[in-house]
């Protein structure tokens, strides 16, 4: 029996660099905990609460605050506009502790970060997460070069 040569680069060893397969890429159907999106959208909220992770389940089972209730009303209004074929306005909210439910998928929501509103398009992959996870409150700090007098070594750096 002939042994296969090992190319050392991983994979099957047949494809060459720069070549792509001719078969069209298929989009895998989205499933959340074994349920498709249409099944999730028809599902009652009580059943959806049972399949989300424990942290979200605890939050949702405790009820909603008045601010969250306002957000739910805005979501229902936007969903009615979508069903009529109109484009809804972006929903602005300060509620970062609200769990993304199946009825919210497809909407655009602006979430307050403490300084500004960050616009987020809710897709299937965001399902069951908190709104606050989608809009980080802290950014990555990129410091510039140190100025004169910042360190002892900068004494010998010529001034521009």
Swiss-Prot record:
Gene3D superfamilies according to UniProt: 30s Ribosomal Protein S19, Chain A
Keyword RNA-binding in record: yes
GO terms of biological process kind: ribosomal small subunit assembly; translation
Pfam short name (any one): Ribosomal_S19
UniProt-annotated stretches for the region Disordered: 1-27
Keyword annotations from UniProtKB, A to Z: Ribonucleoprotein, Ribosomal protein, RNA-binding, rRNA-binding
Keyword RNA-binding: yes
GO CC, any one term: cytosolic small ribosomal subunit
GO MF annotations, alphabetized: rRNA binding; structural constituent of ribosome
Similarity comment text for this entry: Belongs to the universal ribosomal protein uS19 family.
Function: Protein S19 forms a complex with S13 that binds strongly to the 16S ribosomal RNA.
Name of the protein in its database record: Small ribosomal subunit protein uS19
Organism the protein comes from: Methanococcus vannielii (strain ATCC 35089 / DSM 1224 / JCM 13029 / OCM 148 / SB)
Source species taxonomy: Archaea, Methanobacteriati, Methanobacteriota, Methanomada group, Methanococci
């Amino acid at each position: 029996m002939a042994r296969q040569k090992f190319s050392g680069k991983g994979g099957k060893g047949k494809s060459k660099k720069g070549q792509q397969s001719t078969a069209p890429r298929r989009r895998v159907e989205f499933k959340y905990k074994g349920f498709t999106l249409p099944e999730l959208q028809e599902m009652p909220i009580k059943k959806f609460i049972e399949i989300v992770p424990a942290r979200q389940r605890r939050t949702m089972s405790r009820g909603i605050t008045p601010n969250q209730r306002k957000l739910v009303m805005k979501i229902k209004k936007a969903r009615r506009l979508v069903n009529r074929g109109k484009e809804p306005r972006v929903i602005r909210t300060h509620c970062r502790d609200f769990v993304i439910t199946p009825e919210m998928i497809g909407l655009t929501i602006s979430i307050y970060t403490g300084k500004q509103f960050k616009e987020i398009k809710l897709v299937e992959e965001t399902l069951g997460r908190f709104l606050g996870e989608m809009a980080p409150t802290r950014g990555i700090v990129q410091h510039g070069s140190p100025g004169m007098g910042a360190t002892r070594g900068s004494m010998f750096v010529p001034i521009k």
